[in-house]
């Protein structure tokens, strides 16, 4: 999980299909900045305003994520959205439509940040597509406070993994295990994201969604911070092959996971 991004160089982080950015749309942008600033040590500066107020989060002066403000009348779920890299957003958006997905926003230009679109797969899970300009440095990864992994939580993996493979050219590696429905999405042999089929374990009122994992130095301390800052624990800390993991929600309800690198 964390090692997949730590071992990737700048060019690999830009390869088509690779998660290259995460963005959160919230109603109370200032309060959201305060929460994540305290939790991860992020600072903020203005970003592209094409879709409304938007800031870029920085860690040690390098970009790590983005946050935008939803209009008060917009009742969309508050959620972290991963952006998958593309060398031609318009072509990728057309592939999304041809393969049964939908494109809700764009493609559109985002000033110096490049070109983007926001789409959904056939099951309804929302993701972004980003064509970054060559001069733009990739987001920082591999240290606490940065995205470590992205995972699609859905009903079953077979059909949805085919969709993403068709659109982005992923190689797919199913996990062979009774009762565990999981597919790893790879680019040039490198794991970049996962698809986890949970069947009826998925809340019907939520639907399939992309989950974002952030690396932390100490999972237990992070959970204490989350609750102290007004967030809540969704799934308590537990050991995994990739480190100690927990799932939490920020004060507006955006769910994300944190993982402590075991190395």
Go through each PLM region and give its residues:
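Active-site-adjacent scaffolding segments
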Residues: 48-141
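Core segments of cupin and vicinal oxygen chelate
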Residues: 2-3, 9-16, 20-62, 98, ...
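Residues in well-ordered beta-strands of folded domains
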Residues: 58, 68, 130, 151, ...
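Short, low-complexity, polar/charged sequence segments that are solvent-exposed and flexible
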Residues: 41, 62-65, 84-86, 103, ...
């Amino acid at each position: 999980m964390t090692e997949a991004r730590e071992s990737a160089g700048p060019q690999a982080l830009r390869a088509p299909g690779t998660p290259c950015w995460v963005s959160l749309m919230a109603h109370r942008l200032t309060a959201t900045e305060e929460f994540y600033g305290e939790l991860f040590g992020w600072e903020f500066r203005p970003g592209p305003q094409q879709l409304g107020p938007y800031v870029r989060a920085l860690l040690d002066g390098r970009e790590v994520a983005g946050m935008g403000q939803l209009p008060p009348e917009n009742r969309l779920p508050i959620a972290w959205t991963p952006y998958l890299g593309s060398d031609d957003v318009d072509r990728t958006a057309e592939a999304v439509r041809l393969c049964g997905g939908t494109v809700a926003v764009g493609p559109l230009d985002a000033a110096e940040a490049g070109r983007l679109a926001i789409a959904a797969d056939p099951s309804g899970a929302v993701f972004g597509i980003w064509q970054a300009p060559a001069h733009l440095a990739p987001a920082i990864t591999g240290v606490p406070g940065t995205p470590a992994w992205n995972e699609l939580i859905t009903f079953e993996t077979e059909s949805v993994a085919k969709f993403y493979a068709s659109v982005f050219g992923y190689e797919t590696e199913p996990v062979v295990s009774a009762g565990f429905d999981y597919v790893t999405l790879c680019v040039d042999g490198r794991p970049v994201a996962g698809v986890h089929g949970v069947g009826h374990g998925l809340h019907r009122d939520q639907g399939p969604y992309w989950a974002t994992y952030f690396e932390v130095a100490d999972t237990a301390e992070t959970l204490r911070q989350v609750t102290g800052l007004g967030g809540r624990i969704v799934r308590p800390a537990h050991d995994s092959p990739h480190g100690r993991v927990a799932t939490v929600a920020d004060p507006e309800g955006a769910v994300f996971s944190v993982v402590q690198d075991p190395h």
